[in-house]
From Swiss-Prot:
Homotetramer. The active site is at 117 (pros-phosphohistidine intermediate). The lineage of its organism: Bacteria, Pseudomonadati, Pseudomonadota, Gammaproteobacteria, Vibrionales. GO terms for molecular function: ATP binding; metal ion binding; nucleoside diphosphate kinase activity. Major role in the synthesis of nucleoside triphosphates other than ATP. The ATP gamma phosphate is transferred to the NDP beta phosphate via a ping-pong mechanism, using a phosphorylated active-site intermediate. It comes from Vibrio vulnificus (strain YJ016). Its EC number is 2.7.4.6. It catalyses: a 2'-deoxyribonucleoside 5'-diphosphate + ATP = a 2'-deoxyribonucleoside 5'-triphosphate + ADP; a ribonucleoside 5'-diphosphate + ATP = a ribonucleoside 5'-triphosphate + ADP. This is Nucleoside diphosphate kinase. CDD domains: NDPk_I. GO terms for biological process: CTP biosynthetic process; GTP biosynthetic process; UTP biosynthetic process. SMART domains: NDK. It comes from the Bacteria. InterPro entries: NDK-like_dom (IPR034907), NDK-like_dom_sf (IPR036850), Nucleoside_diP_kinase (IPR001564), Nucleoside_diP_kinase_AS (IPR023005).
């Protein structure tokens, strides 16, 4: 198994409902380590930059509006096969299709208000981590 890093967002809907601690508990219980974390409130320019791959798509304006609607928690997770393990812990994007016991099955309100985001590949993880964290803010443990 390979030690790798992934990127995670606790979205505005989950932050507003005070789910940060519960989600962190699940992350750590799954054997992943949080090696960087901070709370940010994205502005329109930051949201556009982070979600640039979706620019021009029908859902892009609503996605930006949601992701700038309140603070988010961004974090870097590390562990064996962290990307796949965190994606399994999150559950499917559509909470109605997410397996019981996953974060989205338990906390998501809808497809958009689905509580969390996680990188889907090593390339995405590297890009997303670098967007929010200089290497000096990451503390492997």
């Amino acid at each position: 198994m390979a030690l790798e890093r992934t990127f995670s967002i606790i979205k505005p809907d989950a932050v507003e409902r005070n789910l940060i601690g519960e989600i962190y508990h699940r992350i750590e219980k799954a054997g992943l380590r949080i090696i960087a974390a901070k709370m940010v409130h994205l502005n329109d320019e930051q949201a556009s930059g982070f979600y640039a791959e979706h620019e021009g798509k029908e859902f892009f304006p609503a996605l930006k509006e949601f992701m700038t609607s309140g603070p988010i928690m961004v974090q870097v997770l590390e562990g064996e096969n962290a990307i796949a393990r965190y994606r399994e812990l999150m559950g499917k994007t559509n909470p109605e299709e997410a397996a019981c016991g996953t974060i989205r099955a338990d906390y998501a309100l809808s497809m958009r208000h689905n509580s969390v985001h996680g990188s889907d590949s090593p390339a995405s993880a590297a890009r997303e981590i670098a967007f929010f964290f200089p290497e000096s803010e990451i503390c492997p443990r």
